[in-house]
């Protein structure tokens, strides 16, 4: 085991605070509408230019191991806030730095770190309660667009495209972001349920212009096994032919004489049909067939539940207003399923999302919810260069997270005003002793910090602006983009309550841990010898991992 170096009390805290300051100072210059850019070196290709706090934080690794510990703990604040709320990373970093800086002064003066932490925790609880009182629901498209614009560093075009996407696929719909091919941002919407399986034979195509099989008001047969024998299918085909409607068959596979018979009937115009493979694999396939059954008001004909293909009736078939089957995808529009059943299914999948441990499973379950709840929207980000594309895409993703958070928990006035307005609730708090009172004071000071930084990044005087904002009430604040005072909500400067709340809670949590830290343990750096050089060289290979994130 390698030898360790241990630092205690003041010298340990001093090193840790240095690390916090280096990381926070690099991140906080990006805060606000006039935030500055940070250029990140890439081991391969051109450097990345960003105004996204968490991207900057993730890049920072310090040479001094003790300073690096402090930096990594603040990095945790940024990435945790980003994971849960999707935005607010820079605000969280600014708050954490302020709480640590102020707190360390009190610790150096001999106050009890545990009592300071208790005071900080009390103040945070009071602030969160006050934020909830200030919060208003975010319902209109205009408000959603405003939240998106602010989060995308005051880009109204991004806000608008996100609001349009949410309007089209609903608040719960899946919205994905990908690289576009032009200079403009584009929005593409897929209505209804779409899955990535196309027709099993091109002879099913009945719309030559679009090269798709289009079925109007079809019956939908769902089967979890392979269909090869036409005898199994005949009874249900006869019933569908009598009803005079088209038929879509979704099964594990359809081949042999069954497929040949369907194709011949289709060409001769006796029965309009189309066959596709069921989406997914294994257990996921069963679940998706069940989803389609609930969406279309049908039943999956499976031996497990005692149903067989030859005894299937029209009552077991699903129905939809329209089905479009392309070469590689099938879209079911306006399924005839019962709304309550669909809602119940969505609730059930949501419960599975809560329990899912892997990101992949969560993503797949989320897709299933979207397909049931109203469709998928695709935002294609346009840009002139690859560097701009990456930066813009990151901002669109941030804005998307922020708008979801706003819809979930509501909105508060932005630009650091909401935190400033909670000061009255915090200043009335009393701790159990003098040290806890000091902890409350630390948070009081930290609540000003985001606004201070926004104003500083604009090149204005923070103290003057803060005093003027404190003279006003409720939504009155300073719009840094236009350098004017007024009602922040009317000016469209809004923050999601969830983002502001998480930024403060995560910042206070990590800062509290730092204040109560009394020893740091790190490996003693190895002497650079003949063998050491080789180890260092191999370490450089770690940079290759970064290539995974590149758009090749």
UniProtKB/Swiss-Prot annotation:
EC?
A: 5.6.1.7
Q: Name one GO biological process term.
A: protein refolding
Q: Write down the chemical reaction(s) this protein catalyses.
A: ATP + H2O + a folded polypeptide = ADP + phosphate + an unfolded polypeptide
Q: Does the keyword ATP-binding apply?
A: yes
Q: Kindly list the positions annotated as binding ATP.
A: 30-33, 51, 87-91, 415, 479-481, 495
Any one Gene Ontology MF annotation carried by this entry is: ATP binding
Main location as per UniProt: cytoplasm
- UniProt cross-references to InterPro entries, sorted A to Z: Chaperonin_Cpn60_CS, Cpn60/GroEL, Cpn60/GroEL/TCP-1, GroEL-like_apical_dom_sf, GROEL-like_equatorial_sf, TCP-1-like_intermed_sf
Q: Where in the cell is it found?
A: Cytoplasm
Which cysteines are cross-linked by disulfides?
none
GO annotation, cellular component aspect: cytoplasm
Which branch of life, at top level? Answer: Bacteria
Q: Which CDD domains match?
A: GroEL
Name the keywords, alphabetized.
ATP-binding, Chaperone, Cytoplasm, Isomerase, Nucleotide-binding
* Family designation: Belongs to the chaperonin (HSP60) family.
**What this chain does, per the record?**
Together with its co-chaperonin GroES, plays an essential role in assisting protein folding. The GroEL-GroES system forms a nano-cage that allows encapsulation of the non-native substrate proteins and provides a physical environment optimized to promote and accelerate protein folding.
Quaternary structure note: Forms a cylinder of 14 subunits composed of two heptameric rings stacked back-to-back. Interacts with the co-chaperonin GroES.
Name under which the protein is recorded:
Chaperonin GroEL
Q: Which gene encodes it?
A: groEL
